[in-house]
Every structure is written in structure tokens, then in C-alpha cells.
Amino acid sequence: MVDAMPENPAEEPTAASAAPNPEAVPDAVGQPEAPVKDRKVPGEYGASAITVLEGLEAVRKRPGMYIGSTGPRGLHHLVYEVVDNSVDEALAGYATGIDVTLQADGGVRVADDGRGIPVDLHPTEGRPTVEVVMTILHAGGKFGGGGYAVSGGLHGVGISVVNALSRRVDTEVRRQGHVWRMSFADGGVPQGELVKGEATDATGTVQTFYPDAEIFDSIEFDYETLRARFQQMAFLNKGLRITLTDERVQESNEVVDDEIAGEGAAGEDVAENGLAEDAEQEPQRRSVTYLYENGLLDYVQHLNSAKKVEYVHDDVIAFEAEDFSDGRSMAVEVAMQWTSAYSESVHTYANTINTHEGGTHEEGFRAALTSLVNRYAREKEILKPKEDNLSGEDIREGLTAVISVKLSEPQFEGQTKTKLGNSEARGFVSKAVTDHLGDWFERNPGPAKEIIRKAIMASHARLAARKARDNARRKSPLESFGMPGKLADCSSKDPERCEVYIVEGDSAGGSAKQGRNPETQAILPLRGKILNVERARLDKALGNAEIQSMITAFGTNIGEEFDISKLRYHKIVLMADADVDGQHITTLLLTVLFRYMRPLIEAGHVFLAQPPLYRIKWSNAPHDYVFSDEERDAAVEAGLAKGWRYPKDNGVQRYKGLGEMNYQELWDTTMDPEHRTLLQVTMEDAAAADAVFSMLMGEDVESRRTFIQQNAKDIRFLDV
């Protein structure tokens, strides 16, 4: 890969440039006329607000510790870190717009209209503060508490890590009446001093960075990945405008329009279908702008629009609350709506960070919701005295909700640091839900009763499902430990070593049983039809023998009774035919796992086997197994060039199914840990994954067709 410098790099600093004034007033000049928040965060954002903790020495040696990986996820994380800094300015009330540009030269440009990074000399470092922020890890306005009351990204930490992992970064600051410029190269080395440029009344920061190709597996940014992330950020920060523009030349067969109709707020000049207005003149350029004046209310409407469902109540319930007592800052926004769907769709955020592991804010929401609904149902005599209380799971059936809290000192826990641990958030959110939702119930008795009736129906279905499950257990002559009779279990009892293959069909299951390693590999063949749980209630889902077999074999149970510590296999491998039917079966299985056992996906326990599509039978060389038409053509061409021969009859065999392979072929190509390829199923964003499953497996045919047309071209980035 050629490591070309940008075509139009910023000019190098000159000796004649004026040095920053150490006595300069740190307050920003020319604040935005319409801040996102009515009340700006008190306190200065100057040199004294930047706290320094340590340098950048370890970042390039161990990038995974800072951005998670050097693959696509880590690469895109660089953009998020820079944008998070701009979002911090919006949270503080000083920024109204963020522009992100994917440049044709491979760089990413992020511009905001906030206060701009301070440029005066740092009191302890003796260098311009912007240089300190760019080159020293943990040098940011978050840590001392003076610059930000609420911080979503790690302000200063993020940009210094981006600098360390880039071959070039150009920083431009508009502050104190001037434009200031400074450039860095080769992992954060300053290319001269800070340059004071032309006068300006504007404020803000522009960061342009070029990822280092020696560190990342690829430096190609995916437009759709960034688009989805920025749309979510716009939802979470109402009134904040985020524009994403892609200036890279698109391939001629690539679908350019993004079918994002109606996403802009009223009065916002958002081009139809997400296209830039000059798309006719520049067909390779695509751009989309997000601006949501109603924030989470718009978010819930967006999530429900992907589902072909009826609404239990017409309007989205939305409310917010704040608490500034005891020297702390806390705020919560909630938007929620019940639909006719059979699954819940509850998403939580803390300081705009996706807390998909939940936490105290989600606990407070759930506890208050369950208590409130049961109390209301008793008071209005909808629940009879002898009837049991409704469970939280029953109440949340069909609920789409987004809970976003903002705290001055968030504490994150969990395996991926995406679980909120602040104990005070539990009571705060609980009280807000009790007060505001309780008031809504009193003012809307008709819809409130419909919500409770739906929960009662869900309760009846759950009890029927439990009864059917218990009856099935009593009737079945189950093997040891209550396992399904068709499960060929492994001998090892160590879950970390064990894996289970979910295989469709008896013939494939037979080959898999013969070819497996019986010590660590279990086989669960599925013989009947797998139910599409997206269109079925829990009782019907649990009445499906194949789904029941999976639940029993895994050992974790489902729903509120799910316990991942009881998982019997740390690898759950879905192995289906390499054709369209096999892909459909895989999608059905993934839908079951996502709806009823989502933590298995979140914890990285679910994998997709990759069986070959063709066998090339060489007469004078070992056989080749390939996985696509393109690989087949390339392998045949390469083999013939080497003088290899294959018979005229059946020289290239297309496998119609796993059952056509004998057990040795299945082991060699698909099950042998030394040679197989497994794709791990990951889930970056539960809300986006929810929308994908609703679209693919729901009843809205037109939405499904549109989604497939737009994403089939770039399926490698589809992250479910």
C-alpha cells in the first residue's frame, strides 16, 4: 500500500508567525448565536482547565488497549473519538453543528463551531495548550471538572490517541479572534510551532487526520457505518446538526442514495434521500445531514418505523428531568411507545455512550415501570385481587424505549465498560419515570388500560409457554442432565473448551457427528422447521421443538431467567448450507438468539461456520475447496497455469448442501480448528441490530427489499 501524503497539506508554520500570548484571556470569542442548550456549563475552558496525566509512549505499541482493535472497528473508533470532542462542546451548550468529511485523499476532516481548543500557554507544561492536548495522553478538559460538567467522549484523550495512530494530523483552531494552525506527523510529532493566522470572528476546531496504514489492517472508512453512528448521535443531542460528506469517488455500481427520507427537522435543508444538492454535478459525492429538534421522541418514531406494527397508543411518551443538588449534575431523557410487537426494544445511553450492558439507569427505569403499571392496574381494578402481579417482561412486551442519562462523573463497569455503575442514577431515573409516566397514565386512562391489557395477554402467553415447556419435559425420554435426545454431546465438561454446532438436517448432522472431535465438539441437528420468532409470541416460540432444543442444550434459559454463567458451550456455531436456503436458516437462528438470548451475541459466543461452495478435484494435485464463484475461477486458472489437471466429469463439484460432503471433508473444511474459518457474530449497536432484524424478518416487504438492495453490495460491513 502506497503511503501518499495528502494532496493539499496545510502550510508549514513560518518563523514570522506570532507566538500565543500567555496572558490571553481563555474565554472564547464570538460564541454561537443559538447554543444547543439554554444554560451553558459554568466555568472557564482555558489553559488552566486542561489537566495533564501522562504521555503517548504506549499508544503505538499497544493500540488495541486504547481503541479496541486495529481492524475496521478500531479504525472507525478514531472518527468517533474526534467527533466525541465536538459533541462535548454541544453538551456544554457551545456548539450547534459538526461537519465530518471523508476526503478523497484518505483523510477525515471534523469541524465544529464550539469554543476551540485553548491556544494560550499551559501553566505547567510551558507549551501551547492545543499542543499539550494533541500530544499528551489524558490531557483534557474533562478531568479537572472546569471545562465540562458532562463529557461523552474522553476530551483530549481521544484526540491525542488519534494523533498517535495517524501519519499526519492538521489542527486548526478558531479562537480569540484568530485562526491558529499546527500540524503533526508520524504518530504525533509536532511539525513546527503553533501558527497564529488570519483574523476571524468565528470559533471552533477543525481536525484533519490520516490513519497510519502501518498500524491498521485497512484505512478505508465505511460511509454506512459512520452514517448510522452519527444519526444516533443526532438523536441523542436534540438540536445538534451533524453532516457527513463523502468526497471519495464511488464505484459505478454502488448505490449512492441512502433512502433517508424525512429524517431532517422541519425547516432544515436536508436533501431528499440523503443526497447532497449538487449530486447531479458531482455524482461521486454523497452527503447527509441529521438534525432532530425532538431528540429521543424522533428516535423512537424512527425505530418503530422499521417495524410493520400497530401502535397501542398514538403519541410517543416523552419526558425529561434534571437534578443539580449536592453539587452534582444529572439529567435524564426518556421516550417510549408500546406497539403490537412481541419483543421489547429498550435502549440506554449514558453521556451519549451506548450502554448495551445496561446499568443502574436501566434498573431504575425497569423497577419504576413495573411498580407503576401494577399499582395503576390494581387501583383501576384491571387486575383482579386474586391475580398475580404482571412481570416486568410482560409489561415491556412491544415496548420501544430510549433512556438517556447525562452525569457529571459517570462510572462505567462490565466486560466492555458499557454498563453504568452510578448508584445515584437508579433512584433518580426511577423517580422521574414514576412521576412523569404516572402523570401520563392519569391523563390518558384509555391508552393506559390498553397497555395493561397487552401486558395481561403477554402474561397469559408466558404462563402457557411455561406449562407447555414443563409438559414437554415430562413427556420426552431425555438423556443425561435433561439434554435433548438428538444432541450428540461432547465428553468435556469445561465450557471454555466446548463448542456446539447447530446443524440443519439429518444427513448433515450425521456427517458432523462422524467427523467431529467428540471431546470438545457437540452436534445439535435441527430436523423440523425453525419458527420466525419475529412474528410469533413467546408461547408459540417455545412450542417450537427446534427452539426448545436449543434453549435446553445451551443451559442458559431465556428472557428474565437467562443466566449466562450456566452456558455449557463457549462457542455456538451455526452451520448451514452455503446457499440461499442456508442463509435463510442462519438468519432465522440469529433472530432467535437476538430476541431471546441476546447476551450470547454481546459476549461473543455466537459464530458462523463457513462451509465451502465448490470442490475442485485435481487429478495430479490435492483437491481445492473454495467458498465463492470468484474463488473457484481464480483457483481453476491458477491450477491450470501450474499444469494441474481435473477430470471432465465432476471436476468442479458444487455442494448443494452439507449432506453432500462426507465426514472427512466436513472436518477438513469446516470443523477442524486448525484449518476452519469461523465468523464471530458481533453487535456494535443494539438499536441498529433491532431495526435490521425487524426489517429482514418482519412483515414489511418493501422495507426489506430496499434494505437488501442497499446493503448487498457491501455485506462485509453488516454488523449484527
UniProtKB/Swiss-Prot annotation:
Activity regulation, free text: Supercoiling activity inhibited by novobiocin and coumermycin, DNA wrapping around gyrase is not inhibited.
Cofactor(s) essential for the protein: Mg(2+); Mn(2+); Ca(2+)
Cofactor comment: Binds two Mg(2+) per subunit. The magnesium ions form salt bridges with both the protein and the DNA. Can also accept other divalent metal cations, such as Mn(2+) or Ca(2+).
Keyword Amino-acid biosynthesis: no
Gene Ontology CC, one term: cytoplasm
Binding-site residues, Mg(2+) 2: D577, D579
Enzyme's top EC category: isomerase
A GO term for molecular function: DNA negative supercoiling activity
Positions with a binding annotation for Mg(2+) 1: E504, D577
Keyword annotations of the record: ATP-binding, Cytoplasm, DNA-binding, Isomerase, Magnesium, Metal-binding, Nucleotide-binding, Topoisomerase
Region (Disordered): 1-42
Domain Toprim: residue ranges: 498-612
Residues annotated as transmembrane: none
EC number: 5.6.2.2
Assembly notes: Heterotetramer, composed of two GyrA and two GyrB chains. In the heterotetramer, GyrA contains the active site tyrosine that forms a transient covalent intermediate with the DNA, while GyrB binds cofactors and catalyzes ATP hydrolysis.
Free-text function comment from the UniProt entry: A type II topoisomerase that negatively supercoils DNA in an ATP-dependent manner. About 140 bp of DNA wraps around gyrase in the presence or absence of ATP, when ATP is added negative supercoils are made. A type II topoisomerase that negatively supercoils closed circular double-stranded (ds) DNA in an ATP-dependent manner to modulate DNA topology and maintain chromosomes in an underwound state. Negative supercoiling favors strand separation, and DNA replication, transcription, recombination and repair, all of which involve strand separation. Also able to catalyze the interconversion of other topological isomers of dsDNA rings, including catenanes and knotted rings. Type II topoisomerases break and join 2 DNA strands simultaneously in an ATP-dependent manner.
Misc remark: Few gyrases are as efficient as E.coli at forming negative supercoils. Not all organisms have 2 type II topoisomerases; in organisms with a single type II topoisomerase this enzyme also has to decatenate newly replicated chromosomes.
HAMAP family, alphabetized: GyrB
Family: Belongs to the type II topoisomerase GyrB family.
The protein's name in its UniProt record: DNA gyrase subunit B
Organism: Micrococcus luteus (strain ATCC 4698 / DSM 20030 / JCM 1464 / CCM 169 / CCUG 5858 / IAM 1056 / NBRC 3333 / NCIMB 9278 / NCTC 2665 / VKM Ac-2230) (Micrococcus lysodeikticus)
Lineage, uppermost ranks: Bacteria, Bacillati, Actinomycetota, Actinomycetes, Micrococcales
